[in-house]
Amino acid sequence: MIYNRLKRFSLSTLVIAVCLLISSCGSDSSDAKKQMKAKADLQGAVIGVQLGTTSDGLATELEKKGDGTKVERYNKGADAIQALLQGKIDCMVTDEAPAKAFQRVNPSLQILPETFDASSFAICVAKDHGELKQSINHAIRILKANGVIDSIVNRHLERGIAVAYTPKTSAGKLNSSSDAPHPSDAKKMGPEALQKLGLKKSLRFATNATFEPFEYYQNGKIVGIDVDVANAIGDVLGVDVEILDMEFDAIITSVQAGKADAGIAGITVTPEREKNIGFTDSYADVRQVIMVNSGDAKAADAQQGFVDKFKSCFIDDNRYQYMLQGLGNTLIITFFAIIL
């Protein structure tokens, strides 16, 4: 009898505790209530960025001015978006293409019309692999001249196609009847040339597959603009391509250490990065934008699904630790209250 009463009470206590914790999610938001309408409003704002990106570097320069601007850094862009939806930050600075991808699934998000900064993406290569850099530059020039890169970018951005380029098989035939253009009359590098450079039989590209539409997962496979560009480069050079997913901050280090041959992950050339790594010619021009939440934090929180809300607030925010501690104390008190 006592055991059944204790069991029922424990279950009830657990359910109540979880519900209270989940319902409190979002209530610990910071004072991120600044109205964001233009670039000038970044002064004194709480800015969210993905750690190690160009956006991080640009926002950090604003933070250094000492005018109250604060930068919150996240391992993934999606984490920064979640913070924006919950009202924990005033805005997020990121590239326009991924900003539009986030906006498609979060209608309350708004991209301010004013450009925050303009930049270009390039592929990073170890400084002692000058011949590989020249070969990739050769491929980029061909792909630009043939309109292949423009086609890849447009098909992703305008038509929302996850795979806009179909690489050739080892037999030299297309895997499907894709309508995307393919390079022709290209000077092949071949696996033998790769081996002479001390590289593997395939060209290994490091990326960070959390940056839609440039690189992300769909149905368990890494897809996106950068993946298609990498495969097209492989076709020009006559080599197979391997895509390696890793944290963004690890890409340059991995290329330096030879764990990857090149890095393609929406990487902007900066003087700081050029101290440690080499860069190819640019293959895409982009602009940095400011993204804000046009609705209030409560409305965005209400739109969040139960499972997502449970994970972000109960697991990611470590609230389960408080619940377990409190539940343990409650059970001890309850146990002695019942038996006495």
Task: Specify the residue positions occupied by each region the protein language model found.
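Bacterial signal peptide processing site
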Residues: 26-28
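Extracytoplasmic small-molecule ligand-binding "clamshell" domains
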Residues: 70-74, 185-266
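Immediate post-signal peptide segment of exported/extracytoplasmic ligand-binding proteins
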Residues: 31-46, 167-221, 298-299
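C-terminal motif of bacterial Sec signal peptides marking the signal peptidase cleavage site
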Residues: 21-24
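Acidic, polar ligand-binding/catalytic clefts
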Residues: 30-41, 52, 106-117, 127, ...
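Transmembrane alpha-helix signature in integral membrane proteins
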Residues: 321-340
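Ligand-binding clefts/hinges and TM-proximal coupling segments of bilobed small-molecule sensing domains
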Residues: 56-63, 67, 71, 111, ...
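Periplasmic-binding protein-like
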Residues: 96, 100-140, 160-178, 209, ...
